[in-house]
A protein has these predicted regions:
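Intrinsically disordered, low-complexity polar/charged tails and linkers
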Residues: 1-163, 168
Length: 168
């Protein structure tokens, strides 16, 4: 029986996570690639939404992109955190700059960048403390990159930039 998922997984997402990591994830769910002629992105697209839930795969992508092997860690001390613990200020800034309307939403599978729209938010997750103030916020940015070369062909791809702000 031939089944086709409506979701199309982008090759850039596979490149950023790594085909091996995605294979291991799918294999742990009992899903193996059987059609040797099928491109990997089509295999993943068909598996997501048919064999596994879209939300489960998106959570895997989020964890891998935020905390996986490609993460660069920099630590800064924030002198005055009072102004940046307000949910409304974060939401206002995200809405103004990225048309983002939630402090807890993941759209990794549906966010795509291009040369004309090169910087987007793919996910935001916040944790509030007992007083309702932001304790931590994780923002996953998706960025379009184009490298122009004089001699050879230009290269373009997208990358994900994880930012975690811990205000404890």
């Amino acid at each position: 029986e031939w089944r086709v998922s409506q979701l199309q997984i982008r090759e850039s997402l596979i490149d950023n996570i790594g085909e091996d990591a995605i294979r291991r994830f799918l294999r742990s769910r009992g899903i193996e690639k059987k059609d040797l002629g099928q491109e990997f992105k089509y295999f993943v697209s068909n598996a997501v939404g048919i064999d596994i839930m879209e939300e489960e795969f998106e959570e895997f992508c989020y964890n891998h992109l935020m905390y996986g092997k490609r993460k660069l860690v920099r630590v800064f001390e924030i002198a005055n955190k009072r102004k940046i613990t307000d949910d409304e200020l974060w939401l206002k800034a995200l809405k103004k700059d990225f048309l983002w309307d939630s402090l807890n939403m993941c759209k990794i599978l549906k966010t795509d960048v291009s040369s004309s729209d090169d910087w987007k938010v793919a996910s935001v997750k916040t944790v509030d403390d007992k007083r309702g103030e932001v304790e931590s916020i994780c923002i996953l940015f998706q960025c379009y990159i184009r490298v122009t070369k004089k001699i050879s062909k230009d290269h373009e791809w997208c990358t994900y930039i994880p930012v975690e702000v811990d205000l404890k």
